């Protein structure tokens, strides 16, 4: 029996579809780490351990990011009010999370600056600034205050950006310029809007999209790794890309990994355009504090007592009144009569000399650095005051800090 070439081709195509049923759209695109370099940063050997690997803890911290070995590139979709170009998820930042998903913040006051824009101007980075003003835009406040917040909160926790990692004749704040270039370069490798558009997912005020389709479109352009998406009231709000890193933040290789968080998006996602046709803004999330601040007590779950005004746990007196405020760039602040609250030397503290720490909420629980659990060495008795710490570092007594509104 003989078959025509056309018949053979048809059969071959059918067999191919059975063996490999994925369409071209479903094919996984290899992620290419951006070419990064810094003339002033310490050179790193080729066998530098990958962050969060078994050898990372004992490696040269100028060449292996630790403990913040998970780098997270984050993007906004701000549609009401519209922020940035209509066809761009704008840049939020690049964050060093710990390998367990927790994170540090505002780690090194000696690295903090008053103005990222002024530093970049001083270093002659006008072209970089022009680009940042188009793609790295906050939904409130000035661009410079936003960039400065990102540097002071996140970049000061990056071990590979310390002064000791740079040559002695490097210009002052060269690490900041290298960091800004890196954040922009990594951002440009993950164009969320184009990834979605190629899969037929575009902003539409009358449609919803399946969460699985959203994720497939993003994952297939990220080495098949799971991308993180966040929603507010069913509307897409942020997209996060997770990496491990081989080498320094400013000259290393970014290696995609799976999302280590959990998505807040429903099965059907709204993706409104930035032209104002997307309807009314979503209602405030239950976890968002009132703009004017909310007053209440901070109780200890499963235990007697509460926090007093200096931030210590006390069981024999009156609970302090805390004000829960809205932090300018996400999260919440806490203030008592003693002053702003923060985690200082590993313990929750409220004092007039403190910076206003950035906390978040999980329901009524107070979260710091991604950790909703807190700890102390013992339960206080009598007139004793006991300090509390985020995570398990404070001791064997574990609990949540619960904000109870008055």
UniProtKB/Swiss-Prot annotation:
PROSITE patterns associated with the record: RNASE_T2_1 (PS00530), RNASE_T2_2 (PS00531)
EC numbers for this chain: 4.6.1.19
Sugar-bearing residue positions: 299
Pro residues bias spans: 280-289
Keyword Membrane on entry: no
Gene Ontology, cellular component aspect: extracellular region; vacuolar lumen
Active site: 92, 150, 154
SUPFAM superfamilies: Ribonuclease Rh-like
Family assignment from sequence similarity: Belongs to the RNase T2 family.
Name the UniProt record assigns to this protein: Ribonuclease T2-like
Organism field: Yarrowia lipolytica (strain CLIB 122 / E 150)
Organismal lineage: Eukaryota, Fungi, Dikarya, Ascomycota, Saccharomycotina
């Amino acid at each position: 029996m003989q078959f025509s070439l056309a018949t053979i081709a048809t059969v071959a195509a059918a067999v191919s579809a059975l063996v490999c049923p994925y369409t071209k759209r479903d094919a996984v695109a290899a992620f290419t780490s951006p070419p990064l370099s810094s003339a002033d940063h310490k050179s790193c050997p080729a066998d530098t351990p990958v962050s969060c690997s078994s050898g990372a803890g004992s490696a040269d911290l100028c060449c292996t990011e630790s403990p913040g070995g998970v780098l997270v590139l984050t993007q906004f979709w701000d549609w009401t009010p519209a922020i940035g170009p209509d066809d761009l998820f704008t840049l939020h930042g690049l964050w060093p999370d710990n390998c367990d998903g927790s994170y540090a913040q505002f780690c090194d006051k000696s690295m903090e600056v008053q103005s990222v824009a002024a530093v970049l101007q001083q270093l002659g980075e006008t072209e970089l600034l022009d680009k940042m003003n188009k793609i790295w835009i906050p939904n409130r406040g000035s661009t410079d205050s936003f960039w400065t917040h990102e540097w002071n909160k996140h970049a000061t926790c990056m071990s590979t950006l310390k002064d000791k990692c740079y040559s002695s004749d490097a210009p002052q704040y060269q690490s900041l310029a290298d960091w800004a270039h890196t954040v922009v370069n990594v951002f440009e490798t993950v164009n969320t809007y184009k990834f979605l558009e190629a899969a037929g997912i575009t902003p539409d005020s009358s449609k919803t999209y399946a969460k699985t389709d959203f994720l497939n479109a993003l994952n297939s352009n990220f080495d098949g790794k799971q991308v993180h998406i966040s929603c507010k009231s069913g509307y897409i709000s942020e997209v996060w890309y997770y990496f491990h890193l081989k080498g320094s933040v400013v000259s290393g290789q970014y290696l995609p990994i799976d999302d280590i968080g959990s998505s807040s998006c429903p099965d059907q996602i709204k993706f409104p355009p930035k032209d104002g046709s997307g309807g009314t803004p979503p209602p405030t999330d239950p976890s968002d504090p009132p703009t004017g601040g909310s007053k209440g007590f901070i109780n200890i779950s499963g235990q007697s007592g509460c926090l007093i005004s200096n931030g210590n746990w006390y069981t024999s007196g009156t609970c302090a009144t805390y004000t829960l405020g809205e932090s300018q760039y996400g999260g919440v602040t806490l203030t008592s009569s003693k002053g702003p609250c923060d985690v200082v030397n590993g313990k929750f503290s409220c004092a007039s000399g403190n910076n206003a720490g950035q906390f978040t909420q999980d329901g009524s629980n107070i979260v710091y650095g991604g950790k909703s659990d807190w700890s102390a060495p013992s339960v206080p008795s009598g007139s004793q005051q006991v300090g509390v710490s985020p995570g398990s570092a404070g001791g064997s007594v574990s609990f949540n800090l619960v904000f109870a509104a008055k």
